[in-house]
Amino acid sequence: MGQCGITSSKTVLVFLNLIFWGAAGILCYVGAYVFITYDDYDHFFEDVYTLIPAVVIIAVGALLFIIGLIGCCATIRESRCGLATFVIILLLVFVTEVVVVVLGYVYRAKVENEVDRSIQKVYKTYNGTNPDAASRAIDYVQRQLHCCGIHNYSDWENTDWFKETKNQSVPLSCCRETASSCNGSLANPSDLYAEGCEALVVKKLQEIMMHVIWAALAFAAIQLLGMLCACIVLCRRSRDPAYELLITGGAYA
């Protein structure tokens, strides 16, 4: 019966180590996605410390790949030292992921205030030229999120760009995709996106932060199961004389 429990734990442990390799790739992808998205929205969110959870989760992903390799070798060879190392590293990674979750919630709460502070400045510097980074960022966000202005398209009337052009129109990036004849004129508001960009940028950034949080929580749960299985194998190996005899007399002695 004890041997059956050992075999089951080892089988689950090997399977979990294979999952760790997959998890490593997923975590690195999530972290990279945060970096790429931040690059698209960095004008609206200047606090680079928000990237800390992404940096940590990429590091955890790389470490999980190594952990999976150590775990597989230690489980197959039934190495007490290897399994103990495996458990300790998993515990450290688990603690790190808890930190990622906490940081994720902290920075998620800061998103709204940070965007509100930055977006006003970005819209004021808009000049409508492609080489200008702020102008490109605004046009990109308005096209991607289907929005116009900070709260709505009327916000453009308060910008220097609107006053200087004197043509009573907003940027073409405010035009709905279905309005083929749209020229940005305020005389045809039905051709323009009605929703403002601030709320949508906040929502987008908070969703990304939640992806990091859920990824960390999901893989932390898997790591707990991995630590449990490794501890079962270690404990049975130490307490069961018959199991110890089987190991020392086998191929991996």
Swiss-Prot record:
Cytoplasmic side: 1-11, 72-85, 234-253
TM spans (from-to): 12-32, 51-71, 86-106, 213-233
Glycosylation sites: N127, N152, N167, N183
Entry keyword Ligase: no
Cysteine disulfide links: none
Keyword Nucleotide-binding: no
Membrane topology: Multi-pass membrane protein
Subcellular location: Membrane
One Gene Ontology cellular component: plasma membrane
Membrane topology, Extracellular segments: 33-50, 107-212
UniProt keyword terms in alphabetical order: Glycoprotein, Membrane, Transmembrane, Transmembrane helix
Function: Regulates the proliferation and migration of oligodendrocytes, a process essential for normal myelination and repair.
Self-association state and partner proteins as the record states: Interacts with claudin-11/CLDN11 and integrins.
Similarity comment: family membership: Belongs to the tetraspanin (TM4SF) family.
PANTHER family: TETRASPANIN (PTHR19282), TETRASPANIN-3 (PTHR19282:SF48)
Protein name per its UniProtKB record: Tetraspanin-3
Origin species: Bos taurus (Bovine)
